[in-house]
Structure formats: structure tokens, C-alpha cells
Amino acid sequence: MKVRLADYVADFLVSHGVTDVFSVVGGGAMHLNDALGHNENLKVTYNHHEQACAIAAEAYARIDNRIAAVCVTTGPGGTNALTGVVGGWLDSIPMFIISGQVRYDTTSRYALQYTETPLRAMGDQEYDIVKSVSNMTKYATMIEDPKDIRYALEKAWHLATTGRPGPVWIDIPVNFQGGYIETDELKGYDPAEDDKLLPPEVDMDTIKTVIEKIKNAKRPVFHAGYGIRLSGAYEVFRKVAEELNIPIVTYWNAVDLIEDESPLYCGRAGNMGDRPGNWAIQNADLILAVGTRISIRQTGYNWKTWARAAEVIMVDIDKAELKKPTIHVEMPVWADAKDFLTKLEKEAAKMAPVSHSDEWLATTQKWKKEYPVVQPRQWEENGSTANVYAFVRYMSSRLPENSLTAVSNGACCVVGNQAYVIQKGSRMANNSAIASMGYGLPAAIGTCIGGKRRSTICLEGDGSIMMNLQELQTIITNKLPIKIFLINNNGYHSIRLTQNNLFKEHCKIGIGPESNDLSFPEFKKIAEAFGYKYYSATSNEEMKNVVDEVLKEDGPLFCEIFTDTKQVWEPKSSTKRLEDGTLVSPPLEDLAPFLPREELKEIMFIPLLDEE
């Protein structure tokens, strides 16, 4: 059967369950734009910047691992998308990007047979995007023969969705897009080419060994990571958690695996986690880490002191993660999280309750109650602004179950991941690895559309929103029920804190009005110009009233919360100056603001480092 190649691409996406596409149209992708835009089974959301397309697709996939395609044009269309794609690469998010390219006979690849040495470019707006994206994708290819399109599409889809997921990219010259192909002549892809790189199935001896180690441990901890969702193991994880009955610790990408009120949840560990979560890890004698790569943000920069009393069982689909030098892993398990947890659940169901688990659980719950992230002083009024910790805690505590939230970077992600109340079934999208400013608005768009256009909270910052401000219009155009809460801390607050800490003798630079070299607009005028109903708050009391009012209404809405520019991130890993003036990086049980040594000593089941 003869079909236009661009239509073949659109039909392929539909046949693989794709229903949504994010795109900015362009001449180099004209036939792709036509095919995708007129396919009755696809809804194309047109953004105002290609970075927003990529971020929206990345956040969309986080909801239930369904892929939304991205379609961009040649040259700047492709390069503009890179930040969103590298975010998906580092956080292991399945993404499918299709780009247009100049006519094949005007590409530098084609010209190479004549020039011998490569041209930088030959065609108008030509750029060989595959060379740039090969380090941030599982598969990237330019179609140099139309007959290769089936093979490329099938291989790309398979690699994006198997093993450790990630982005894939197919670049298609414009003359091939509009040309016709004979589908019966197309060569297919055999997954066996690449499946040899996948881990073997977990054997039952490994599972039984893990069960025995948990039985014999006095202070076991379940360190749950986002790989659990990526593998489709969320439901079985919940069953395993109940059966093991041991404390659960999460971190940024995985905060929504378990609700705050669960008697198993004890906290979020890491250099910007909370005290209870870190105390659980640092006091543990056994850690079962599933689907978490245990990044430096989780171990802290003094990683040799991380979980120093624990035997670590780490389950990961990427063999390299099990061997990196910043962690110690006594029992590496190279496996798919769903395969591992499914088999673990069957064995755990047979396991008799472990008597010491209740006492250890009670201890972690006591920490959670007595050492909350949001302190009483943060609820007090300062006369001019709201407190960002109080705001995040209050707003999130008012959300219903199964709510959707997209979180940008800076104050939004630090405070959001520390203080956000996760309700049962709630989802929170944030990108922790690349952590780019400008993430919040397009991520909220992807989260909302991926969540079947349910009401969505967008946590943005005054610095971050400027990176993708144009997406305010995308929300309006598509009538998306997104409620934007803008944290206004008068500039780049994370960098302000760094400059306060390290460069006190110098004046501030590049952070906002106080450095006299960077300024921001009046967001009330911006919001109203785009057509948003606007709210604001400048105190904790006003914040509570405004939040209650905003949450009762339908979006899109814009609510600006003016927050204290002196509020530091706390608790957090921080350099400590000893009495002799020496600077040291304390282990993660010792977060700033530092507790008295006697108090910390009572909390720890193991000796403090200065006692060893």
C-alpha cells in the first residue's frame, strides 16, 4: 500500500497508543505538521517554544508512562528542545521526538561524498541535530533512505519503553516526509537486536536471600525510587510495603509514591531532605533500595559517611548504577523493579510479622511528629511577606486526594519536596537531575493533559517563570484548568543564599533588584494581560485566605505569593565550622540548623563520627 511517509509516522504513533503531540510548526517539518495535525486520533497542543514542547511531553509521561510525541522543525526548532530532552534523559523518562530536516540532497551528510571533509551546513537552516542529541537519547537517527522509516520507528519505540527508559529522536528530511512509500517493502525491526542488554529475570534464591536479610535486620529501611513507577510496579510496591511493614523513605522524583499520613512513611532523605528521612537511612542496619540510583543529592557530598552502618541491597535496571564510586552496595541486584517486586511480594506474603519492626517503625514515626520540616516560627507573621515553607505546607494540605502538581526549580522544588503534603493518590512532577529553570509552566501543561485535563497546581518562581513566560498563553488557548502559584522571592533566591554564604565580602550580582543588574516585571500586569484572574498574598494570614479562595475556583488562575528573602533552606546539609576553625561536611544525620550534640546523640543508634 502506498502512503505518504508523514502519514505513516502519524499512524504508527496512533497504533502505539499515542493520543497527544506537543509541537511548534516549521517549514522543515511541514508534512509532519500536516499529517499529525489532521490525524483525527491525535490532539496536537501547539506551544510557543520548543523547550516547552519537550518539557510538557516529559511531564506528561510521568503521569502513567504514556508517551506524548514531540514534533519540531529543523535548525533552531531542534536545538530549542534540547533542555527538555536532556531532562528526560537524566530522569529516565520515555520520550519520542520527531524533527524535520532540510531536503536530504542539501544536507552536509549528502555533500560529504563530494567534499571529503564535513561541511558545517549546506541547506537553509540545516543542522545535523542527531550529532547533538546522541548523548541524551537511547537512539537517534536521521532517515537517509525512506525505506528505513519502519525500522527506525519500531526501534525507537522499543528502546524508549524497555529497559531503563529514555528519549529517542528521529530526524526526517522534508522531501522524504512528503514522499510516498510502499509499506509492503519496508524492513521491520527485531527487538532481539537490543534485548540482550536487558537484565535477566530475578531468581527466587535472590528473593529468599532478601527476605531473610529483612527478617534478621533490626532497623531495615525501604528506600523507594521513581524507577518503581517507571517499571509499572506502583501497585505491587504498595502491597510489598504493607507486607514488609518497614519504614519507607523517598526522595524528590519519588515523593508521591506514598502519602504523608501513611504509618510506613517516615521522610525524604538527602542533602535537602528532612531529618526523619535521613535519620532512618543513617541509623539503618539494612537498606532495600529499589528503583533509585541513589544520586549525590541523596548521599550528600560526604558520601563515605552515607548509610555507614547499613548493608545495602540495591535493585536497579542499569548495571552501571550499581557500581558507581559514590555508594556502597553489599548486595547488587541487576533487575527490573517490577520483576523484583512482584516476586518479592509473593514471598513477603508468606513471611510472618517481624516483632522488632513495630518498635523501629514507632521510632521513625516519633521523629516525623517531633521534627517536622515546617517549624512554628515559620507560621509567625513578619509584617511584610508570607513564609514559603508555611505556604507550601498549607496549600498542599488543602488539596484533595488524587491531585496533580507540577513543580519548577529553585524555591519551588527545594521547599516543595521538603514541605509538600502528599495526599493519597496525588502526583507531583518535578525534574530533579537537570533541574532547569522554566520547568514549571510547560510541566504543568503536560501534567494536566496527561492527567486527562484535571485541575492541576503549578508551583513556579518569579525567576523561573521568565524562562518560559510565553506558555501562559498556551494554557489560556487550550483552556487548561491550571492554577499557577507564583513564589515571588524577589529574584534568584537559591543563588542569593549561595552568595550570602560564600561571598559575603562582595556585593550581590545577577540575582534581582538588590544587585541592581536584574529586574522582573509586575506579574499582576503580566497575568492580567494574558487573561488570568489574579490573586496575591503578602502575609501568612492573607496567604491562607487566598489559597482557600483559589482552590475553590476553576482554573486557569494566577496567584502570587510574596515570600521572605531571608528564609534559608532548612533543614539541609551544610558545611560546619569546628571550634578550631576547620570546615567540615557533616554526615546526613547532622543537618543545619545543627542540633545540640547531646540531642543528636540520643537520636542516633550508632556512634557519631566524632566519637569513633
Language-model regions, residue ranges each:
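N-terminal alpha/beta PP-like core and its mobile active-site loop of ThDP/TPP-dependent enzymes
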Residues: 1-355, 398, 481-484, 504-505, ...
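Thiamine diphosphate
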Residues: 108-124, 271, 325, 332-334, ...
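N-terminal cationic-hydrophobic initiation segments that often serve targeting/anchoring roles
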Residues: 61, 160, 241, 396, ...
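Active-site-proximal structural scaffolding
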Residues: 241, 280-281, 388, 468, ...
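Conserved short loop/turn motifs at secondary-structure junctions
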Residues: 225-230, 380-381, 461
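A structural micro-motif
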Residues: 42-43, 93, 246, 310, ...
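Phosphate/pyrophosphate-binding active-site segments
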Residues: 1, 144-147, 212, 310-409, ...
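Active-site diphosphate/adenylate-binding microenvironment
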Residues: 6-9, 14-19, 27, 32-39, ...
